[in-house]
A protein has these predicted regions:
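Beta/coil-rich, acidic/histidine-enriched accessory regions frequently appended to metallopeptidases
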Residues: 1-3, 7, 13-15, 88, ...
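Early extracytoplasmic/domain-onset interaction patches
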Residues: 1-36
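A surface-exposed beta-strand-loop module
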Residues: 7-9, 40-103
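Solvent-exposed beta-hairpin/edge-strand motifs
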Residues: 32-61, 125-142
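Extended, low-hydrophobicity, Ser/Thr/Pro/Gly-biased non-transmembrane segments
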Residues: 34, 88-167
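Juxtacatalytic substrate-recognition/specificity segment
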Residues: 172-304
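Acidic/His/Gly-enriched intrinsically disordered linker/tail segments
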Residues: 287-294, 299-379, 417
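Pan-zinc metallopeptidase signature
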Residues: 342-425, 431, 444
Length: 584
């Protein structure tokens, strides 16, 4: 067994870590630190924050040699085979992120991949102690004899920790039950929360999701669930774990104590929570075969991330709808937003879903100003594919099967193998075969067309989408809520510190034709100073004219003519936002 001891050093924003373990049989201990975190497919290079690694046998310091960016070898030739080794190191922890480590006076967080140096090629149990007077520690692992117990390395690296001051300052910790399972909620970063409202709504999310996956017994695949969340201005994100999740949110989206009507963006939080909770089944149990087990030392490639993130993105809004947390109008509004997020980028038909999945390591998580023109997201586009696949299943089975039924059947079929760790995962590109095995319905042609076939034009997607919507009594129409001239200009502002920057500028738009690009800082339009609050109205006032726009590109002041009078190209018009409405 591996024995870890973690000590926080608040003023230095560091954790010191000690690992005690037996001397290996060949007297050479090979240690490594993960380079990425499951669920976040980009190399994070955590070893860059690790310092002062030392090795000891009793009071004797042993040689430590670094052999790669994240691997070390301890020469324990001087130590007898029956001895124990003590490895010590420090990790800098001052990054607010779901996949990082953080420590200050108010809060600590540990994503295990950032901290746990471990022997190579091992999967043995581990226990984690904290020397942290004045702190409460929360983790999804079982706690026995003051140590958090992990059955294996995978469980150790999948169980994050939140540290909160024992005086309770800025921390909200409570437990709710869903289908008989305790769900602990740990929220830091705010002094006021309406816990009763959040408890009621989260319980509905949890119970609805459990019923989705196990409609008969309503039994989740974990004995305890831990939702950890930190709040801060402008924060947003989530990362799934087998028995919990780590979320980031802006405090403005949550109801404060005594606030009876939640903020307008509260549904954003509920949707995020539903997304990550859904992942406890789809990603943490049902997963690609290449992730069994995870190799966190290098990139691990899959063409199927569109399944695991795209399907989840589809159901993240369906769950709140079924839980009666949003109405049908809000659901279809979110649906339309997802449609626009995908098809509003020119990169939508520049990459297949299989390519987008495979290239996650260098594209999705490494966005550039060119990304909207050349890339698509397997989240948003994957959700559209999921919708079309489900519609095809429904049509070919006369309503007997849908994607939901496939997921339920899939989990039911392999659940026992997942529990006893004998399941080998979904082979790369094997979803069509899986569907046929479960349903007897051939669906390979549909998946091949929407997932792997290159150069499928967005017109085909829109046509297929329109047909699928008709089956549900819905149709697409241009979003009349958008200011027409503003939408037709290709100009979209975002805040960047004290500046206002242009976001993605579609090619063939008037803004693009005028030479504007993402990152430019517009300061005046038609002789008037630009402000964020009135920018759309300013553009509306220029409709049908050619006007002057003044902007900075870097430190250079530039003046261009913006043509808002000429007809727009069909290619650009296809990028305009649409919404879903009733057929009648």
């Amino acid at each position: 067994m591996l024995h870890y001891l973690i000590t926080p050093h608040v003023r230095r924003h560091r954790y010191s870590v000690q690992l005690v373990l037996p001397v290996p049989y060949d007297n050479l201990l090979k240690l490594e630190l993960p380079t990425w975190t499951p669920g976040s497919y980009v190399l994070r290079e955590y070893a860059g924050r690790l310092t002062n690694i030392r090795a000891y046998w009793e009071d004797n310091e042993l040689p430590v040699r670094q052999v790669s960016k994240a691997q070390w070898v301890v020469d324990a030739a001087e130590a007898p085979v029956s001895a124990t080794l003590r490895i010590e190191w420090e990790v800098f922890a001052y990054s607010v992120g779901i996949h990082d480590a953080y420590l200050d006076d108010d809060r600590g967080f540990i994503n295990p991949s950032t901290l746990f140096l471990h022997p190579s090629n091992t999967n043995e149990p581990a226990e984690v102690f904290f020397d942290a007077p004045g702190w409460n520690v929360q983790c999804a692992l079982p706690l026995r004899a003051n140590a958090w117990q992990a059955r294996n390395l995978d469980e150790l690296l999948d169980s994050p920790y939140t540290l909160t001051p024992k005086d309770g300052h800025g921390a909200h910790i409570w437990t709710i039950e869903a289908c008989g399972i305790p769900h602990q909620i740990v929220i830091t970063g705010t002094n006021s929360l309406n816990q009763d409202r959040m408890s009621s709504d989260l319980r509905k999310i949890f119970e609805t999701t459990i019923a989705f996956w196990d409609p008969d017994e309503k039994k989740p695949p974990f004995e305890r669930y831990l939702l950890q969340m930190h709040l801060g201005a402008g924060l947003y994100g989530g990362l799934e774990h087998a028995a919990g999740t780590m979320l980031l949110e802006d405090p403005k989206v949550l109801p404060a104590e005594g606030e009876t009507t939640p903020p307008k963006d509260y549904i954003e939080f509920l949707t995020l929570a539903a997304h990550e909770y859904f992942h406890a089944w789809l990603v943490k149990r049902l997963k690609p075969s290449c992730f069994l087990p995870y190799d966190l030392s290098k990139e691990v490639y899959s063409h199927d991330l569109w399944i695991f993130e795209g399907f989840t993105s589809l159901y993240e809004s369906i769950i709140p709808l079924r839980a009666d947390l949003i109405d049908e109008a809000t659901y279809w509004e979110q649906f339309g937003r997802r449609f626009n997020n995908a098809l509003g980028r020119e990169g939508f038909d520049q990459m297949t879903l299989a390519e987008s999945s495979f290239n996650a390591w260098i594209k999705l998580y490494r966005q550039t100003k060119d990304s909207p023109y050349s890339q698509t997201s397997y989240y948003a586009k994957g959700a559209l594919a999921a919708f079309l696949i489900s519609d095809a299943l429904e049509q070919r089975s006369n309503g007997e099967w849908s994607l939901e039924h496939v997921l339920q059947s899939w989990f039911r079929t392999v659940r026992s193998k997942i529990t006893d760790r004998t399941w080998s995962g979904l082979p790369d590109g094997g979803f069509a075969e899986l569907v046929f095995e479960l349903t007897g319905i051939p669906i390979a042609d549909v998946i091949e067309h929407w997932v792997s076939k290159p150069n499928v034009d967005r017109c085909e997607w829109i046509a297929a989408f329109s047909t699928a919507l008709e089956h549900r009594g819905k149709k697409l129409t241009l979003d009349a809520n958008q200011h027409q001239a503003y939408a037709l200009s290709g100009l979209k502002l975002r805040r960047s510190g004290a500046d206002l920057e242009l976001d993605y500028v579609p090619s063939a738009s008037p803004a693009f034709e005028a030479g504007l690009f993402a990152g430019d800082v517009p300061i005046a339009l038609d002789g008037m100073r630009i402000t964020f609050e009135r920018f759309d109205r300013m553009v509306e006032a220029c409709a049908g004219r050619i006007v002057e726009i003044v902007f900075f590109r870097g430190d250079r002041l530039t003046v261009r003519q913006l043509d808002l009078a000429s007809p727009r190209s069909d290619a650009f018009l296809m990028l305009l936002p649409q919404r879903v409405i009733d057929l009648s």
